[in-house]
């Protein structure tokens, strides 16, 4: 489900004032093209296979890092493990990082949390998500069967099989907090890293049913990258 080789999809991209856009390394774990379009409006995007190591990514001299959505169990070995390691290395290196869906789950694993199979997967375009910082409720589009455990409450609404990953250590070298939860079952829908320009969301901001819901999250990330480059 990943691309074959790294390529810049919009080389030489500039903003409305003719200034070069920041360069983003986007790890493709099964990325939707709508997400790439959203990113390409804000960044010069280096589209990288999920098997790309962080050392290989650094050769592109990125200003930021993105981990995409994708299918399957985030705890499986292989490409997902490489993507998780690259994500954790990007956080430790101080790059701004955003993760969506599977990218969110990989961030959870890198933070030492377990991922697990949900009793009832989140499917459809009407999943309510609460921003715990503002109290705002977003109506989101979701399509996933795994979740990241709550650091305080553990696995919420788990599948009867008990399928889950092992709990690990925090490879991010940064504390984190739960920022978003599902209003129906209270499962974790997003993390903010404390003291880092990094966050994740479990849902699809590029496909939200409301006229404005969630798509500004791409703008939030772009602002983080601008702040990073401004020092």
Set out the residue ranges of the language-model regions.
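Catalytic beta-strand/loop cores that center a nucleophilic Ser/Cys/Thr
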Residues: 136-195
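Active-site-proximal beta-strand elements of phosphoester/diester hydrolases
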Residues: 23-28, 140-141, 199-203
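RNA-binding accessory domains that recognize and position tRNA/RNA substrates
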Residues: 1-60, 72-74, 82, 169, ...
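Residues that mark the start of a beta-strand
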Residues: 21-25, 44, 96, 139, ...
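Cysteine-nucleophile active-site neighborhood
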Residues: 69-151, 211-220, 225
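Short, Asp-centered acidic motifs that coordinate Mg2+ and/or phosphate
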Residues: 63-64
């Amino acid at each position: 489900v990943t691309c074959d080789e790294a390529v810049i999809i919009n080389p030489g991209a500039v903003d409305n004032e003719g200034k070069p856009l920041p360069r983003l390394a986007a790890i493709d774990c099964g990325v939707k093209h709508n997400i790439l379009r959203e990113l390409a409006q804000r960044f010069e995007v280096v589209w990288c296979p999920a098997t790309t190591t962080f050392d290989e990514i650094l050769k592109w001299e990125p200003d930021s890092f993105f981990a995409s959505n994708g299918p399957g169990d985030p705890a499986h070995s292989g490409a997902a493990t490489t993507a998780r390691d690259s994500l954790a290395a990007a956080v430790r290196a101080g790059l701004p990082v955003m993760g969506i869906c599977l990218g969110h789950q990989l961030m959870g694993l890198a933070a030492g949390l377990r991922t697990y199979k949900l009793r009832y997967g989140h499917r459809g375009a009407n999943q309510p998500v609460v921003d715990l910082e503002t109290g705002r409720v977003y109506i989101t589009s979701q399509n996933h069967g795994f979740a990241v455990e709550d650091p305080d409450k553990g696995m919420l609404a788990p599948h009867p099989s008990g399928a889950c990953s092992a709990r690990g250590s925090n490879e991010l070298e940064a504390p984190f907090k739960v920022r978003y939860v599902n209003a129906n079952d209270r499962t974790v829908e997003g993390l903010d890293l404390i003291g880092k320009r990094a966050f994740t969301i479990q849902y699809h901001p590029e496909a939200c049913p409301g006229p404005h819901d969630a798509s500004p999250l791409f703008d939030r990330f772009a602002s983080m990258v601008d702040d990073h480059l401004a020092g």
